[in-house]
Amino acid sequence: MCPVYINRIASIHAESRNEKPYFSAQEPDYKEMITNANLRRRMSRMIKMGVACGLECLKDIPSEKVDAIITATGLGCLADTEKFMNALMDNREQMLNPTAFIQSTFNTVGAQLALLLKIHAYNVTYVHRGLSFESALIDGIMSIAEGKQHVLAGAMDEITPTSHIIQQRLGLLKGTTAGEGA
């Protein structure tokens, strides 16, 4: 196995639980990181977190030198999924706005990074609950072993009040405090 070096890290994470029963990410002002106001306005919280961290990590690397974007999420864009499902039920499956569905797909962060930076390289997203980030790291290590040099590997997740209640009721959070971030 060849050596792998981490050249840059970025994180948006929780600092305290505040009033919520889970760790909620302390988000920065995204205006400096995601300069396009229209694009920023259309992005959900999770997409902003992931894209901001990805842009920070890739800011000194020319787009043509990025060999891979490998992202991971445990459950995906939950807020957008909830928004789409609620609209689906409220509108009886008619006259739906596709934006919430499009942004609820798991590969949105990797795709946004590729579009923003004009990166035409390997781009994959792992969705596997608790093993997603590990899968992304393994893929990144294997990519480097194959000769790729500049690989972005990252993860992001969000928690909504509804998803937190569901996970609690299913017993998925026993002995842990849930958290979100990128």
Identify the function of each model-found stretch:
Residues 1-134, 142-149, 156-182:
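Conserved "HGTGT" condensation-loop signature of ketosynthase/thiolase-family condensing enzymes
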Residues 137:
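Short-chain dehydrogenase/reductase
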